[in-house]
């Protein structure tokens, strides 16, 4: 087959084969029946009419295809379209369609939409068919009507400003809202600027005579806080806009920069005596000096019970007395660490000439005992052990007398100073007890008589288990 051109035959309406013009291989060719075709071009009108005539004569589609040398798919498509629409013209399916959005149709769609803005596209399509504007072949589809409304009809509503101004009468004017400027009268500040929050919300502000003035103390505190926080004030001033006045912003900054929480501790409301207020820095200084006086001593705090260690309570601040008050929230399980908590302590000034009263470390001295001392410079609060804590036995000490434990608890009807013993527990040997001086082996939980040192742990002691 030559590459330049080919000789083909076209089927005429008589069914004979005649010479055809030269076709390019890239645009046309011969089908499987030997008939010529051109890519992208519809079948000639005479061939279409011949297919329909043969179909009316009762010829089968396969015979029509073989006789006219047209593919069976083309014959079926032409006949199906003819039975459906009654037309044999090409381009109805998959081809170029005639323009249905004519100016007359677009104008009618605009009239329908202006008369009833809520009308749907399918209602407009039915209205076009009812009024006879279009027929079944030229009526636009629903999607086409929506596109016409979106692109062409709505442009009539969104006219430019010049056309709107021209349509007005000579005595009427239309001013855009963007050109409105706030009034420059002296009363503009009291009525609120147009661009301010009060102006936008329509809130009328009171006049300058009716405003409440800040007192001198508030203004002075605001000046001090603004001077101390200059960098913050500068950054806030940079964020200001020219629409706001300086006086309302200064008043707002004054309230925000003021300290909201007091820096003093007051006594509890259920206190019976008058208590003075002491600021937080003074309390912190006294606590820091107390810590430094404790750490400055060269004596180490030992754990042996035979030695007495002194704890310096106050070294310089002799004008204060620590008074413990019993409250409802305090319990018998309070520890000496609660002395450092400002919740349970009240500081009370006393005269330098009188001696300080004795104080109890806990609200229930009958259970834990008490120790007293006069608070003075150079004196130490001396105690054998810290109240409320069981005596600690070093790891090297094997026995401990129960009389020391009895001394921790006041003698009474509920407590006995004798050693605790029970027949059920006395039958066990030393190998069944914990030999180490841990929490379970502490005499605080297991109080017995004079306990000797535990025997060395051997493997034979556990053979019975």
Swiss-Prot record:
Ranges that cross the membrane: none
Subcellular location, record wording: Nucleus
Database matches in InterPro entries: Homeodomain-like_sf, PAIRED_DNA-bd_dom, Paired_dom, Pax2_C, PAX_fam, WH-like_DNA-bd_sf
Up-regulation conditions: By retinoic acid in combination with activin.
DNA-binding region ranges: 26-152
Key word Kinase present: no
SUPFAM superfamilies found in the cross-reference section: Homeodomain-like
UniProt GO cellular component terms: nucleoplasm
Chief subcellular location: nucleus
Disulfide bonds: none
Region (Disordered): 206-227
Tissue expr: Expression starts at late gastrula stages in cells fated to become the primordia of the otic system and the pronephric kidney. Expression is maintained in these two structures through late tailbud stages. Does not appear to be expressed in the thyroid gland.
GO biological process: cellular response to retinoic acid; negative regulation of apoptotic process involved in metanephric nephron tubule development; negative regulation of mesenchymal cell apoptotic process involved in metanephros development; nervous system development; positive regulation of DNA-templated transcription; positive regulation of thyroid hormone generation; pronephric field specification; pronephric nephron tubule development
PROSITE patterns named in the record: PAIRED_1, PAIRED_2
Keywords: Developmental protein, DNA-binding, Nucleus, Paired box, Segmentation polarity protein, Transcription, Transcription regulation
Function recorded in the entry: Probable transcription factor. Involved in kidney development, acting synergistically with lhx1/lim-1 to establish the pronephric primordium in late gastrulae/early neurulae.
Protein name listed in UniProt: Paired box protein Pax-8
């Amino acid at each position: 087959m030559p590459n330049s051109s080919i000789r083909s035959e076209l089927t005429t309406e008589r069914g004979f084969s005649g010479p055809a013009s030269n076709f390019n291989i890239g645009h046309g060719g011969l089908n499987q029946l030997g008939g010529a075709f051109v890519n992208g071009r519809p079948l000639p009108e005479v061939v279409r009419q011949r297919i329909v005539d043969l179909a009316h004569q009762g010829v089968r589609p396969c015979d029509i295809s073989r006789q006219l040398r047209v593919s069976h798919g083309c014959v079926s498509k032409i006949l199906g379209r003819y039975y459906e629409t009654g037309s044999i013209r090409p381009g109805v399916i998959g081809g170029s369609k005639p323009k249905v959005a004519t100016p007359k149709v677009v104008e009618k769609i605009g009239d329908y939409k202006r008369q009833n803005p809520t009308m749907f596209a399918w209602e407009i399509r039915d209205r076009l068919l009812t009024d006879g504007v279009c027929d079944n072949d030229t009526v636009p589809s629903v999607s086409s009507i929506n596109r016409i409304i979106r692109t062409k009809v709505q442009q009539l509503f969104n006219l430019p400003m010049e056309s709107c101004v021209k349509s007005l009468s000579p005595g009427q004017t239309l001013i855009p809202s963007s050109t409105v400027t706030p009034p420059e009268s002296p009363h503009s500040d009291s009525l609120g600027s147009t661009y301010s929050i009060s102006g936008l919300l329509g809130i009328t502000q009171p006049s300058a005579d009716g405003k409440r003035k800040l007192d001198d103390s508030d203004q002075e505190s605001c000046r001090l806080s603004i001077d101390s926080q200059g960098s913050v004030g500068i950054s806030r001033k940079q964020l200001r806009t020219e629409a706001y006045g300086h006086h309302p912003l200064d008043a707002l900054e004054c309230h925000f920069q003021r300290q909201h929480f007091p820096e003093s501790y007051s006594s509890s409301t259920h206190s019976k005596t008058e208590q003075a207020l002491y600021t937080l820095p003074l309390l912190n200084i006294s606590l820091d000096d107390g810590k430094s006086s404790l750490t400055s001593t060269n004596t180490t705090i030992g754990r042996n019970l035979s030695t007495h260690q002194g704890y310096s309570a106050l070294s310089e601040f002799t004008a204060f007395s620590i008074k413990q008050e019993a409250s409802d929230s305090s319990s018998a399980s309070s520890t000496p660490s609660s002395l450092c908590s400002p919740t349970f302590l009240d500081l009370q000034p006393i005269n330098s000439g009188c001696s300080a009263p004795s104080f109890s470390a806990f609200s229930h001295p009958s259970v834990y005992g008490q120790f007293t001392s006069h608070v003075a410079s150079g004196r130490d609060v001396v105690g054998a052990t810290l109240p409320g804590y069981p005596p600690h036995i070093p790891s090297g000490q094997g026995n401990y007398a129960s009389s020391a434990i009895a001394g921790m608890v006041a003698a009474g009807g509920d407590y006995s100073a004798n050693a605790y013993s029970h027949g059920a527990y006395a039958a066990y040997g030393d190998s069944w007890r914990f030999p180490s001086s841990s929490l379970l082996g502490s005499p605080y939980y297991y109080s017995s008589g004079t306990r000797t040192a535990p025997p060395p742990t051997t493997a034979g002691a556990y053979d019975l288990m």
